[in-house]
UniProtKB/Swiss-Prot annotation:
The keyword DNA-binding applies. Keywords: DNA recombination, DNA-binding, Transcription, Transcription regulation, Translation regulation. SMART domains: BHL. GO terms for molecular function: DNA binding; structural constituent of chromatin. The lineage of its organism: Bacteria, Pseudomonadati, Pseudomonadota, Betaproteobacteria, Nitrosomonadales. GO terms for cellular component: cytosol. This is Integration host factor subunit alpha. The gene is ihfA.
Length: 102
């Protein structure tokens, strides 16, 4: 199961005491700022969580799996995420059943 924007809004409402409208605006604003930064070619660094970065992939040859015909796959930019060491350690500790140390 994945954590959704609606669930993030509910968590802000429950844990911080914001009303639902304010919580939704904060979540939307956060996502919009991340989108804008990435669209402008900037990375997004969230301390203790990870980095969102852009990677340029060059054009490369591909193949249509149905016909076997060679077709070019166009150059594009993709968003990558690299988890911080802190996040990786917390996930691994949880997987092993160890207590979570922040």
């Amino acid at each position: 199961m994945a954590l959704t924007k609606a669930e993030l809004t509910d968590l802000l409402f429950e844990n911080i005491g914001l009303n639902k409208r304010e919580a939704k605006e904060i979540v939307e604003c956060f996502y919009e700022e991340m989108r804008t930064a990435l669209q402008n070619g900037d990375g997004v660094k969230l301390s203790g969580f990870g980095n969102f970065q852009l990677r340029t992939k060059p054009q490369r040859p591909g193949r249509n799996p149905k016909t076997g015909e060679e077709i070019p796959i166009s150059a594009r930019r993709v968003v990558t995420f690299h988890a911080s060491q802190k996040l990786k350690s917390m996930v691994e500790a949880n997987y092993r059943g160890e207590p979570n140390v922040n």
